[in-house]
């Protein structure tokens, strides 16, 4: 009887979530966030083992003696969706491509990637098929890739739909075709700019919160996975937000207390 009660409760919860627009695939994706700690376990062979390092001092990118660079993340574009603002996306890409010392990191959901398991009308609300969405993404990003403007790319919950169904990540295809770093579920990057070094952690995001505080809480949770980063980047929630805080540490050589500022950036969306 107890097992039947639990089963009925689970069915009721799934029904409510479906009515709220949360698909079963989205629920599975949220579990991926819960598994981030397991993914980073030392015994996990698939855990990230090395950060992607970029020098902006004339070694890899940019010209020597640069004091700063600009990073404009791209994500939640949903190419293929009937309400995707493709022209605005093209304008962003043009700016990144033509502006000196400006780069991007692709944080997922670049395509709509609707399947028969998607919530609502799903595939009936897209303008063209998944293979066309992938090809269009490749062609739109190609000019940036040729100029080494894309520092990494990862999947989002929309790409996760085909990953779960057929073990195919559209963003891995894009990365391989364009020769850009594939970050997987979580991205670690090191930027050397002038005499400074910045550590960055990226994740598409998995929050369904409708409040600013809830969304900030979701990106702050990334500190439990990636410690002592300078910048945390996240998308998914379709609302732009920014926050910062200060963390203190001890210099092991001098014993002095070191203050370090951490930045939290949540990007928006290009759905009309």
Name what the model sees in each region.
Residues 162-214:
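An acidic, phosphate/nucleotide-engaging active-site surface
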Residues 75-81, 193, 204-207, 268:
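Short, flexible loop/turn elements at secondary-structure junctions
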Residues 1-73, 78, 184, 188:
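Acidic, histidine-bearing metal-coordination/catalytic regions of metal-dependent phosphoesterases
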Residues 8, 136-150, 238-252:
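N-terminal short leaders/motifs
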Residues 64-65, 194, 258:
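Short, flexible hinge/linker loops that cap or flank conserved catalytic cores
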Residues 6, 21, 45, 148-149, ...:
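Short, flexible coil/linker elements and helix-boundary hinge sites characteristic
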Residues 106, 197-201, 206-272:
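Conserved beta-sheet core of the metallophosphoesterase superfamily
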Residues 52-183:
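Core catalytic region of metal-dependent phosphoesterases/phosphodiesterases
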């Amino acid at each position: 009887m107890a097992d039947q009660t639990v089963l009925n409760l689970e069915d009721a919860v799934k029904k409510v979530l479906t009515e709220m627009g949360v698909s079963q695939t989205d629920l599975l994706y949220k579990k991926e966030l819960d598994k981030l700690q397991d993914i980073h376990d030392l015994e996990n062979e698939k855990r990230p083992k090395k950060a992607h390092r970029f020098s902006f001092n004339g070694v890899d990118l940019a010209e020597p003696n640069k004091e700063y660079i600009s990073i404009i993340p791209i994500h939640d574009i949903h190419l293929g969706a009937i309400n995707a603002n493709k022209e605005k996306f093209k304008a962003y890409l043009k700016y990144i491509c033509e502006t000196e010392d400006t780069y991007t990191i692709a944080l997922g959901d670049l395509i709509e990637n609707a399947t028969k398991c998607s919530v609502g009308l799903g595939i009936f609300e897209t303008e063209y098929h998944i293979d066309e969405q992938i090809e269009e993404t490749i062609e739109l990003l190609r000019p940036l890739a040729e100029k080494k403007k894309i520092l990494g790319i990862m999947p989002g919950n929309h790409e996760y739909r085909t990953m779960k169904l057929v073990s195919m990540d559209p963003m891995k295809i894009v990365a391989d075709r364009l020769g850009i770093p594939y970050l997987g579920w979580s991205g670690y990057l090191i930027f050397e700019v002038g005499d400074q070094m910045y550590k960055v952690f990226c994740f598409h995001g998995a929050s369904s919160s409708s409040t600013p505080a809830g969304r900030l809480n979701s990106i702050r949770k990334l500190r439990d996975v990636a410690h002592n980063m300078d910048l945390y980047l996240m998308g998914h929630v379709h609302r732009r937000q920014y926050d910062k805080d200060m963390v203190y540490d001890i210099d092991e050589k001098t014993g002095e207390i070191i203050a370090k500022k951490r930045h939290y950036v949540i990007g928006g969306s290009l759905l009309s």
